Amino acid sequence: PVEAVIVDVGNQRQQTFLNAPEATVMGVEAEGKKYFEFADQAAFISNKRWLVQANYTWSDSDVSVGEGDTVITLGGGGRPEQASFFIQDGSRLQGQSEHVANLQLGWEDDTARSQATFILNYVSERITARGAGVGTAREPDYLQEPGAVLDFVYRKDFTVKGRDLGFALELRNLLGTDFEEYQEKGNKIRINQYDLGQSASVSLTARF
């Protein structure tokens, strides 16, 4: 597997990539989807099919590094270096989160030719780049916890003068989730943090 690693090149710290010797990944995924109808309720509710859909994935990984394994990095001048200096044996695969979940709540209205969905995604902590070193002198890995992101999508089809049109509204990151990359060695050290912002997009399409 290809992994990002932080290396010192002269007086600068740079990110490069290397091939980890070996990794094992295992996991379990569960998914469910159900529509609900409420015929005896008010028209706004009874005209629609209400959707509940969820997906959850648990995964675990293990990177294996032996004594004789070598890698070539940006700062090594093309010479093979000990892989164990850059990757800790038994550590989690870079970019892999233990928990990934998705929840969708929405409705579909065939009469009004419309649908709306709230989409909640959650991703737990993951490694974004390796810290190099040996023993207690090893630089902590760079970590990120994407957290929860909530989006809303609305679509409606309609006809004007015999022409089929489609309207779409998309609202992204309603919870205002930020990006944060950090190291942990006793205390949390922020490496990179910024506001992802919230966005909205509107589109109108014509079908020919």
PLM feature spans:
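Membrane-topology and secretion signals of cell-surface/extracellular proteins
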Residues: 1-4
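Flexible hinge/switch segments at interdomain interfaces of large molecular machines
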Residues: 6-8
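Gram-negative outer-membrane beta-barrel transporters
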Residues: 12-130
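Short, contiguous acidic/charged loop-to-helix segments that flank catalytic cores in large enzymes
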Residues: 19-21, 89-93, 137-145, 190-191
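Strand-connecting loop/turn motifs
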Residues: 45-49, 98, 109-113, 147, ...
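C-terminal beta-signal and adjacent terminal beta-strands/loops
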Residues: 121-132, 156-208
